[in-house]
């Protein structure tokens, strides 16, 4: 196994873990990095299984909260309403994602230039929203009514366009609907759990005939890197956005999208 391939797998896993839960689009970063690194994964296995590292990271960090919610379900109306709200928010992406999976993966994901443009446009939109003088009406995710959760879930559907960012779409939608920045990011975490598990299961099923474990080392390297980086981001993001907002992510999106366009132009 070439050392260069291991390094590329580690880099891509690190990128996946660092970008999955922040509003910069992990898909865009992983696809563009893989394109410029010339990384060839074994079948579709690497691209599918690398997501599992990030999924396990958020489940581990939020295990105590998830357990507390589960134990409260029999007696707490608030807990039941919260779980219902998260599942309701997940529903639009589940339905549209299942119906349009082939088109999204075979057409949109194969267009690096589109990804770069969407990164830039999304960065400009996120910057504008972060600068709006919005007055939050909701500061606790457990107070989000189901109707608000559903609207946030509809925003999440925009993330099916590579480069949009699942967390970016949900956070932007939540802010526009009257949430504060911290709870918007936290609801995005909770919504990520069923969404990422569902997307992972669908990808695994759709790619079942192409899956290959010929290079377990590459898969393990990317998985571990995504897992460790994901833990770091999930543990630190809420405090970060409470103090700095989302402008740093907006600027990063614009820079990466611009650099990607320049790179694609130079490489012809």
UniProtKB/Swiss-Prot annotation:
UniProt EC number: 3.6.1.27
Coiled-coil zones: none
Membrane topology note: Multi-pass membrane protein
UniProt function note: Catalyzes the dephosphorylation of undecaprenyl diphosphate (UPP). Confers resistance to bacitracin.
Similarity remark: Belongs to the UppP family.
PANTHER family: UNDECAPRENYL-DIPHOSPHATASE
UniProt protein name: Undecaprenyl-diphosphatase
Lineage of the species this protein comes from: Bacteria, Pseudomonadati, Pseudomonadota, Alphaproteobacteria, Hyphomicrobiales
């Amino acid at each position: 196994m070439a050392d260069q391939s291991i390094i590329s797998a580690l880099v891509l896993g690190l990128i996946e873990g660092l970008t999955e839960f922040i509003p910069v689009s992990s898909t865009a970063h992983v696809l563009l990095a893989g394109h410029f690194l010339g990384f060839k994964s074994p079948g579709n296995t690497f691209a599918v299984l690398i997501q599992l590292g990030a999924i396990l990271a958020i489940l581990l960090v939020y295990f105590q909260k998830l357990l507390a919610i589960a134990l409260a379900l029999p007696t707490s109306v608030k807990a039941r309403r919260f779980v219902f709200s998260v599942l309701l928010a997940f529903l639009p992406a589940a339905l549209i994602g299942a119906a349009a999976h082939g088109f999204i993966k075979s057409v949109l994901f194969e267009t690096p230039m589109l990804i770069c443009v969407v990164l830039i446009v999304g960065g400009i939109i996120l910057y504008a929203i972060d600068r709006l003088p919005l007055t939050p009406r909701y500061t606790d995710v457990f107070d989000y009514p189901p109707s608000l959760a559903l609207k946030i879930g509809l925003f999440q559907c925009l993330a099916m366009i590579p480069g949009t960012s699942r967390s970016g779409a949900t956070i932007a939608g939540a802010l526009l609907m009257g949430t504060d920045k911290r709870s918007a990011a936290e609801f995005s975490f909770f919504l990520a759990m069923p969404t990422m598990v569902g997307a992972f299961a669908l990808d695994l099923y759709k790619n079942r005939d192409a899956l290959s474990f010929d290079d377990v080392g590459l898969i393990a390297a990317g998985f571990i890197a995504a897992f460790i980086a994901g833990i770091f981001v999930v543990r630190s993001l809420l405090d970060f956005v409470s103090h700095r907002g989302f402008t740093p992510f907006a600027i990063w999106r614009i820079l990466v999208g611009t650099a990607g366009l320049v790179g694609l132009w130079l490489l012809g």
